[in-house]
Amino acid sequence: MSVHIEAKQGEIAETILLPGDPLRAKYIAETFLEDVVLFNQVRGMLGFTGTYKGEKVSVMGTGMGIPSISIYVNELIQSYDVKNLIRVGTMGGIQADVKVRDVVIAQAASTDSQINRNTFAGVDFAPVADFSLLKKAYDAGIEKGLSLKVGNVFSADRFYNDQLDKQQLADYGVLGIEMEAAALYTLAQKYGRRALAILTVSDHIFTGEETSAEERQTTFNDMIVVALEAAIK
């Protein structure tokens, strides 16, 4: 057990999918996994382990934002020796060719959070995805005929932030805005683990097009399948 996860040793797989929403974790477990076992419900952060195509895979919510995902990733790695961590979440698109419901693979994650500057004494550390996981996910998506976008995303420290210059981010090629990937990548690099963020565009920040809360919780299956295929290859 750890402070925020009640699983026993051996109950969490070496590879875990990490949606922000614990109800999406439940949906993934019930829809895609077999022989599912609940391993965590501390603070309502549901975690499950099952099998996908015969391979052991876990899925667990992380909550929203860098502080929350940092807690769970630290504990999953330090207390349960998880090797591969794949975020499956949503983002707001900011490029004209990034459409609502598109699947984006985050090659790198910029951020306005001070967490890395505090860690690295003012140095701008560049958090990046694990290339082997990225390639597996990309290949899986192409095999399924998906039009994937791969590139830089922005991990925002605040959801509501009128001062963030989103147009400047778009001008520099950032594909969209989410809230967790930079922390996930930084911690994976710190501990020598593999991490990837696969994201579905839930809304477009400039056009105003958006999906419903229910759709965000219970659909976006393309992203989930790409993540699971990357997890077992």
UniProtKB/Swiss-Prot annotation:
Keywords in alphabetical order: Glycosyltransferase, Transferase
Membrane-crossing residue ranges in chain numbering: none
Any one GO BP annotation for this protein: purine nucleoside catabolic process
Residues at the active site: 203 (proton donor)
SUPFAM superfamilies: Purine and uridine phosphorylases
EC annotation from Swiss-Prot or TrEMBL: 2.4.2.1
GO MF entry, a single one: purine-nucleoside phosphorylase activity
Coiled coil: none
Classification via Pfam families: PNP_UDP_1
Reaction catalyzed: a purine D-ribonucleoside + phosphate = a purine nucleobase + alpha-D-ribose 1-phosphate; a purine 2'-deoxy-D-ribonucleoside + phosphate = a purine nucleobase + 2-deoxy-alpha-D-ribose 1-phosphate
PANTHER family per record: FI09636P-RELATED (PTHR43691:SF11), URIDINE PHOSPHORYLASE (PTHR43691)
Oligomeric form and interacting partners: Homohexamer; trimer of homodimers.
Primary role: Catalyzes the reversible phosphorolytic breakdown of the N-glycosidic bond in the beta-(deoxy)ribonucleoside molecules, with the formation of the corresponding free purine bases and pentose-1-phosphate.
Protein name: Purine nucleoside phosphorylase DeoD-type
Organism: Listeria monocytogenes serovar 1/2a (strain ATCC BAA-679 / EGD-e)
